[in-house]
A protein has these predicted regions:
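The substrate-binding groove and active-site-proximal loops of carbohydrate-active enzymes
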Residues: 88-94, 119-125, 210, 238-239
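N-terminal, positively charged nucleic-acid-binding surface of large information/translation enzymes
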Residues: 9-12, 18-114, 449, 453
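Short secondary-structure capping/junction motifs at helix and strand boundaries
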Residues: 60, 97, 107, 111-123, ...
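Alpha-helical recognition segments enriched in aromatics with Gly/Pro capping
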Residues: 1-33, 48, 101, 107-108, ...
Length: 461
């Protein structure tokens, strides 16, 4: 039985698909004005684990992820400039060019981290007509008003607006310190923004209300409803979406269809760098390429993320990543040396299913993985069971092989001397020679075919 935490009800609930065995899953994708940082990617790793667990349980998942390539202003309060236009000025490229470039780099990052591609990518700019139609439906039901800079959603028309975030609307109104302009309430938000008459935007479209561009929130409501229906199984995102973006998605869909959009709302928590949230706006952030440049396999970062529950903040430091890289190499080497897989151990599989079905409890699942590695089971059974675990872990254990290396002549000479000492039963000499080999960074293993020597736990990327 799969149990998942639902942010909307603030409870762990049994997951039952609305239309079994199909599951509709929508995950908020990147705003492609810059590179994704590893904090962003922690959320996508959590969502990848969720999808793998759903499929592990026999469900057929239709996974939709959006690409925000227009409409996301530098402030979630509908102020500031479009991040795509800002990125265009920063790079000297067109907004369309940077959207394509950063979409590709994001997809490459996902590949490096072995995050499964969604069933469907959907770009906001490919769905302008759907967004306009959605806004028209909201307008027809009396939930909008017009200002000099756009069409806004009137949140006062929804008595339970902000329930997902448990917002204190009256308190927000009393304590607001920002210039709301013509907004009637601090929580009202833009559905369509008008282009400034004295500015030519790269991304703008004609609409029934005038030339402009869609607000940030409308794309997710319109595209998820198009591909998954107005009420589907699971909607995911980062914890930063709980306060603004997701309540606004829910409001739009309530106004249009009378639903809260998704049966489960799930959120991954932040990665912290020195106990502070990692964010592009802070001026410095770490990319997957940063890890590669420092000699790390990106899958070591994936393994690092599995050390904490997705609903717990995770503090990043290089020492912790070193530990994850070492542990991953140990796991890879064990799987490689076990040889061909045999039959699964049902006892371990039952325990593993219990951990992952307990709201994706990956720390316990990883602990069980090490228990399997240390067990006295036949190596073929260990191998088969570990590879089945890896359907969820996503570490590509079946594909890994030690890097082929040329062993220096002086090391081979020590190996040969040790072999001779063993043949003559000079065990102390043999042990001393092994210590010399180890100190030089190599390890020797005695097999029926003779001694095998290699550099100690060197993984290929």
């Amino acid at each position: 039985m799969l149990q998942l935490y639902d942010t909307y009800t603030r409870s762990v609930r049994e997951f039952q698909p609305l239309h079994p065995p199909e599951v509709g899953l929508y995950t908020c994708g990147p705003t492609v004005y810059d590179y994704a940082h590893i904090g962003n990617l922690r959320t996508y790793i959590f969502e990848d684990i969720l999808r793998r667990v759903l499929e592990f349980n026999g469900y057929k998942v239709k996974h939709v992820m959006n690409i925000t390539d227009v409409g996301h202003l530098t402030s979630d309060a509908d102020t500031g400039e479009d991040k795509m236009e800002k990125g265009s000025r920063r790079t000297g490229k067109s907004a369309w060019e940077i959207a394509e470039f950063y979409t590709q780099t994001f997809q490459e990052d996902m590949c490096h981290l072995n995050i499964l591609d969604p069933t469907l990518w959907c770009r906001a700019t490919d769905h302008i007509a759907e967004q306009i139609e959605f806004i028209q439906s909201i307008e027809a039901k009396g939930y909008t008003y017009r200002t000099s800079d756009g069409i806004y959603f009137d949140t006062s028309k929804l008595p339970d607006y902000g329930y997902l975030a448990r917002l204190d609307i009256e308190g927000l109104q009393a304590g607001q310190r920002i210039d709301m302009g013509e907004k009637r309430s601090v929580t009202d938000f833009a559905l369509w923004k008008f282009s400034s008459p004295d500015e030519r935007r790269q991304m703008e479209w004609d609409s029934p209300w005038g030339r402009g561009f869609p607000g940030w929130h409308i794309e997710c409501s319109a595209m998820s409803a198009k591909y998954l229906g107005p009420f589907f199984d699971i909607h995911c995102g980062g914890e930063d979406h709980i306060s603004v973006h997701h309540p606004n998605e829910i409001a739009q869909t309530q106004a249009c269809y009378g639903t809260r959009l998704a049966n489960f709302w799930m959120h991954g928590y932040f990665l912290q760098l020195d106990s502070a949230k990692m964010a592009k706006s802070a001026g410095g952030f770490l990319r997957v390429q940063t890890l590669v440049d420092r000699g790390y396999d990106p899958l070591a970062y994936r393994f690092f993320c599995l050390s904490a529950h997705y609903r717990a903040k995770l503090n990043f430091n290089w020492e912790s990543l070193d530990g994850a890289a070492t542990a991953l190499n140990r796991l890879r080497l064990a799987a490689y040396e076990w040889g061909a897989p045999g039959t699964l151990d049902e006892g371990y599989m039952d325990k593993f299913a219990g951990q992952i079905n307990d709201d994706l409890n990956m720390p316990r699942a990883v602990a069980l993985t090490w228990d399997l590695v240390k067990s006295e089971l036949p190596s073929a059974t260990q191998k088969a069971t570990l590879l089945e675990f890896d359907r969820i872990l996503g570490l590509r254990l079946a594909d890994w092989k030690p890097t082929e290396q040329v062993v220096p002549d002086e090391i081979m000479a020590l190996v040969q001397q040790r072999q001779q000492a063993r043949k003559e039963k000079r065990w102390k000499d043999a042990d001393a020679l092994r210590d010399q080999i180890t100190a030089a960074g190599y390890e020797v293993k005695d097999t029926p075919q003779g001694a095998q020597v290699r550099r100690r736990v060197k993984a290929e990327g």
